[in-house]
């Protein structure tokens, strides 16, 4: 079992922490704010625009510079994967104009509650109000 620190409690950090913990690692997520996922509330005007339902190939047409840089990321965990994961957390989704994907409830707070429950279920330790001031590489790993 590895000891893993995730710095930043946005949606990406929350999912990274949960996935690492789900693989049997001891995971601590550090978030400087009073709660995780704070910026999720402003996506889609508070409705939580999760992703776009268009084919992955089509997404590259909308990336103005160096789309090849994102190939491995977008093919490694696709928009369909994120939709399936969120639905597995009990959040029903809908696709609107422009292939934009939202929770049926139109509330970002529902997605945030599900993400927090997902992390908790995987055993992630969350430290709020915890700003990481420095990071130092040592032989055994890192010191935060």
Predicted regions and their residues:
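Conserved N-terminal/central alpha/beta ligand/cofactor-binding core
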Residues: 32-125, 130
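Short coil/turn connectors at secondary-structure junctions
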Residues: 1-2, 23-25, 36, 122, ...
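N-terminal Rossmann-like FAD-binding beta1-loop-alpha1 element of flavoenzymes
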Residues: 2-29
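A conserved short coil-to-beta-strand element within the FAD-binding core of flavoproteins
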Residues: 128-141
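Short linear motifs in intrinsically disordered
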Residues: 29-32, 134-136
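Short glycine-/acidic-enriched loop or helix-start segments at secondary-structure transitions
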Residues: 16-17, 39, 137
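Hydrophobic aliphatic residue packing
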Residues: 4-7, 27, 111, 123-124, ...
């Amino acid at each position: 079992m590895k000891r893993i620190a995730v710095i930043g409690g946005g949606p990406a950090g929350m999912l990274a922490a949960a996935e690492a913990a789900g693989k049997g690692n001891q995971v601590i997520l550090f978030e400087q704010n009073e709660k995780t996922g704070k910026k999720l509330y402003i996506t889609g005007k508070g409705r939580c625009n999760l992703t776009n339902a268009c084919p992955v190939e089509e997404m590259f047409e909308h990336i103005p510079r160096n789309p090849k840089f994102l190939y491995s990321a977008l093919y490694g965990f696709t928009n369909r994967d994120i939709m399936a994961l969120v639905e597995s957390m009990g959040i029903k989704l809908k696709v609107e104009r422009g292939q934009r994907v939202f929770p049926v409830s139109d509330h970002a707070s529902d997605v945030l509650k599900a993400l927090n429950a997902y992390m908790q279920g995987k055993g992630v330790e969350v430290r709020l109000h915890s700003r990481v001031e420095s990071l130092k590489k040592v032989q055994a790993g890192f010191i935060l």
